[in-house]
């Protein structure tokens, strides 16, 4: 009888413990990833990533327009106070996956030097043998349908050398490939004739994708994620994740405004999305630090960790 009573006590104690978990504590346990465009203080950045329990980092390491000579030789642009390769090694040693993030040109529709991307992919493939990063992440988001074939060809060529991770714009979920058929050479379009949407085509020539569900209302983001999930399930070997962003400059509407009023709903939303997609990405390190603690990390900033502050 005593043993049964003890089991009941343990069981109900665990329920009470779980129910008393704060939204921030639940956030810490949520499976999540982080975009990083720069890391002014690498020591603080690593503390932030590890203590917030991020398990993957998308680390910006250059673009073709400005860093081709460096990237094509297997070197990386350092977006902080520490050599990018050393930082990647440090993160991986802490069981944090890394995707090397690059982009093509400052102008999103400029594909004039796209052939150089294959040289970079080849060099990154060689670098991956020693650096052991997960994939080459392409932050390439053209708005012109005329370059969609070049976008797909870029991924296809790069994938010969290194796993490819692609950004997806929400509008591409609804871009019927048949509607842009005229932008393709007939023979190349034939490769994608079974694809319903542009997202289907991108998933066909990449290994991973990230849907950029920016700062919209919760209902809009949920619609995007549901439609993304439908397409994702048509490609079972493809890993697709959503990316959520809270813009600290937005104060009127969207999830950023909601977060400023009460962060509970966002943390719950983040947890639910992560469960559905087996992980969710936050964009990006500087903005998220500002959202949580009311300051952007800088080279001389002290590290702060704990419950979010109420920013004025």
Predicted feature locations:
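Boundary/entry segment of secreted carbohydrate-active catalytic domains
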Residues: 20-55, 60, 102-108, 166, ...
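Structural preference for beta-strand elements that scaffold enzyme active sites
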Residues: 29-35, 55-58, 97-101, 133-137, ...
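Aromatic-lined carbohydrate-recognition surfaces of secreted/lumenal glycan-active proteins
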Residues: 33-37, 97-108, 152-194, 239-255
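Short, acidic/polar
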Residues: 36-51, 112-129, 187-202, 224, ...
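Acidic (Asp/Glu)-rich catalytic clusters
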Residues: 46-53, 81-95, 126-131, 198-204, ...
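Active-site groove signature of glycoside hydrolases
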Residues: 58-63, 123-150, 281
């Amino acid at each position: 009888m005593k043993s049964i009573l003890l089991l009941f006590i343990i069981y109900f104690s665990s329920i009470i413990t779980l129910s008393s978990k704060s939204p921030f504590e639940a956030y810490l346990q949520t499976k999540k990833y982080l975009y990083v465009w720069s890391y002014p203080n690498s020591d603080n950045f690593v503390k932030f990533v590890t203590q917030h329990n991020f398990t993957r980092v998308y680390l910006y390491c250059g673009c073709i327009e400005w860093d081709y000579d460096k990237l094509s030789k297997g070197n990386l642009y350092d977006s902080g106070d520490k050599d990018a390769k050393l930082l990647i090694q440090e993160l991986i040693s802490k069981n944090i996956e890394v995707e090397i993030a690059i982009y093509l040109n400052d102008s999103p529709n400029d594909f004039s030097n796209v052939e150089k991307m294959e040289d970079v992919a080849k060099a990154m493939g060689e670098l991956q043998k020693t650096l052991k990063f997960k994939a080459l992440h392409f932050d390439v988001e053209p708005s012109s349908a005329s370059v969609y074939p070049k976008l797909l060809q870029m991924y296809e060529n790069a994938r010969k050398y290194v796993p490819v991770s692609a950004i997806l714009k929400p509008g591409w979920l609804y871009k019927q490939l048949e509607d842009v058929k005229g932008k393709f050479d007939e023979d190349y379009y034939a490769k994608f004739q079974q694809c319903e949407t542009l997202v289907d085509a991108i998933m066909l020539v990449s290994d991973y994708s990230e849907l950029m569900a920016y700062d919209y209302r919760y209902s809009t983001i949920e619609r995007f994620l549901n439609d993304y999930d439908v397409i994702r399930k048509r490609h079972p070997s493809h890993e697709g994740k959503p990316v959520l962003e809270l813009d600290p400059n937005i104060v009127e509407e969207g999830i950023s405004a909601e977060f400023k009023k009460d962060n509970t709903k966002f943390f719950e939303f983040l947890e639910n999305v992560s469960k559905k997609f087996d992980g969710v990405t936050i964009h990006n390190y500087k903005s998220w630090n500002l959202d949580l603690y009311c300051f952007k990390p800088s080279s001389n900033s002290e590290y702060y960790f704990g419950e979010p502050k109420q920013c004025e």
